[in-house]
Amino acid sequence: MPLSPVAYLLVTHGSRDPRSPWMARQLAERVQYCLQASTAAPLWVETASLELADVPLHQRIQQLGDRLCCHGGTVLQIVPLFLLPGVHVRDDIPAEVAIAQAHLPTLDVQICPYLGSHPHMGQLLQRSFDPRMGSRVLVSHGSRRAGGNAPIEAIAAQLGALPAYWSVAPSLAQQVEQLLSTGTQAIAILPYFLFAGGITDAIAQQVHDLAQRHPTIQFSMAEPLGATAEVAHLVAQLSDRPAPDRYVSC
C-alpha cells in the first residue's frame, strides 16, 4: 500500500520584493531534500505568506489541506519562517490556522516552532560573522512593543555583539559610534533577516555611508540568512519538533 503524503507549509511574513518569494521557494526545495532523506513517504513542501499574498493564509492552508486529504494525508505542518516571537508568531498565524482547521475536520494542522527558536541558530549566526573583525553589531528590524527586543538583546549577548535596530533606537549608526569611541578599528555587521529585501539593501547603504565617513575603519557586512543548506537544515529539524538528540542531518 502506498504511503500517504506528508505536507509542510513554510510561512514567511510576505514582501513586495520579488526576491523574497523566489528565495522562499529555493528554501522549500532544500528543506524537501533534507526531509526526504529520513522518510519514504511522498513529501510536499510548499510556501505561503502571512501578508501581501494573493489569498489569505487560512485560505492557502485550506487549499493545500484539501489536496492533502484527497491523497490520504492526515497531517499538515505549518512552519513559521520567522526569527522572533512577535505578534505574527504568537497571534496571527495561530488565528489563521484555527480558521483553516475548522474547514479541515479530518486533517491535523500543526504549528511547528518558529525558525528563530532553533537552539542552533546562535551557532549559525556565529559562523556568519567575519572572524577578522574585532567588534560586532547584530541588526534586526526592532519592535516598539515593551520587551519585544529582549530576544535580540539575548542573541547579541550570546554572539558578543551590540544589538541595533532598523525601526527603533539604538540604530546601527549609534552603535557604530559607540564602538568607535572605544577605539575599535574593525566592525562586523550582521543583518538578522531571513532574506534580502528593501531593508537589508538600506542597511547595506548605511554601512557604505559609514565606511565613507570613517575611511580608516574596516567594515564588513554579512548577507542575510538566505535559502542556504544550513538554514534548510534548521527548518527541517523544526518541522517534526524533534528532541535535541534526534536531529536529522542532510
What are these regions, as identified by a protein language model?
Residues M1-C250:
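Active-site-proximal alpha-helix that buttresses catalytic centers in soluble enzyme cores
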